[in-house]
Amino acid sequence: MSKKALERVKAVLKELKYEPNAYASALANSRRYDFYCLMPKHESEAYWEEVEQGQKKCCEIRRDFHVHVTFKYYKRNNLSSFKEQYEKILEAKPDGVVMVPAKLDYTRQFTDQMHIMNIPFIMLDSYLPDLRPLAFYGQDSFASGYFAAKMLMLIAHDEKEIMLMKQTLDGVNVASKQQDNREVGFRHYMKDHFPNVKIHVLDLPYQSTKKIHNQLLEGYFLKHPDTHHCITLNSKAHLVGDFLLKTNRRNVQIMGYDMVEKNANCVRNGSISFLIAQHGYQQGYYSIDALVRAIILKKDVTPVNYMPIEILSKENVDFYRRTQI
C-alpha cells in the first residue's frame, strides 16, 4: 500500500472512530499470563478460602486468555513469612499480583518493588491509597463498623454494657488495618448514640488454643453476668458462639462478620444474632478479572470498589448467594 493510500485509510478510520478489537487480539495471542495472589494462610472453610475460590473461578472463566494464578500464603503473626513470600513472587516476575496487606511498612516494601518492576497489583481487605494499587476490592471499613454498631444496638438498646471480642497478634495489634478501621467506625457510632453503654474488651489471643479461649470466656461471663450482647469485628464470632451453646447461655448472643460455615451454624442455633457478609468470593473473582481487563484487554478499571454491606440473620442465612457474580 502506498503512503498516500495508507494516509487515506487512517483518515477514514479516524472519522469512523475505529478502535482495534482488543478482545479478539487477546484471544489470538497464545501468550500465558501469570498472576500471583498473596494472602493469609487459612484453614478449610475460612473466609480467605472463599476469596481463593472466586479467583480460581475467574481463571476458569477467562481460560481462553491463558490466565494462571499461583497462591502464596503468609502467617498473620509472622511478618518474616510475608517478606519471604513476596520475595518469591518478585523473583517470579509475574504479570500481575493480588495481595492482602500485612503491616504497612512491610507492605510498602513489597509495593515499592512492584512499582519499580511495573507489576500492577490489586489490594483486598485493607485500602491503602498511598501505596497506589491498580484497584481495591473490599468494604468501606469505617462505614461497616458504624453499621455493625447500629445493627447491634437495635437489639441491645436497653443494655448498660456490651462486650467487644478481639483477637490480637501480640496483645495489642489486631490482624489487619481493616479491623482497626471497623473499630473506629463502631466506636464512633457508640459515642454519638449510646455514650453511656460500657464497652468491655475481651482479647482471645490469635495463637491461643480453644481451651484457653473458653477459659477466658468463662472468666469474662462470671465477672460480667449482665453482658447479654457481644460483637466481634472479625470472622471468628463462632469462637464465642460455640462457647455460648456449649455452656447453655441462651440469654447471650454475639454479632460478627463473614458467612463461613462455623458462623452460619451458630446463627442457625441462635448464639450469633447477625453476620455481616463481605462477599469474599466476589472480591476474589473481581480482583483477577480486573487484572485481565487492565493487562490483557487494555481496559480502564475502577480504582476503588466497595462491596455491599449485607446483614444475615437466622431468617435469611440459608439464602445467602455465596458464589453469585
Task: List each model region and its residues.
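Flexible loop/hinge segments that line or gate small-molecule binding clefts
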Residues: 105-143, 260-268, 272
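Hydrophobic alpha-helical
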Residues: 89, 96-116, 198-263
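Hinge/beta->alpha junction and helix N-cap segments in small-molecule ligand-binding domains
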Residues: 40-49, 70-80, 138-144, 166-188, ...
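Hydrophobic alpha-helical segments within soluble ligand-binding/sensing domains
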Residues: 136-163, 213-214, 279-296
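Hinge/cleft segment of the Venus flytrap/periplasmic-binding protein
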Residues: 12, 16, 173-174, 190-193, ...
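Amphipathic helical "hinge" segments at domain boundaries
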Residues: 20-80, 84
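N-terminal helix-turn-helix DNA-binding module of bacterial transcription factors
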Residues: 1-30
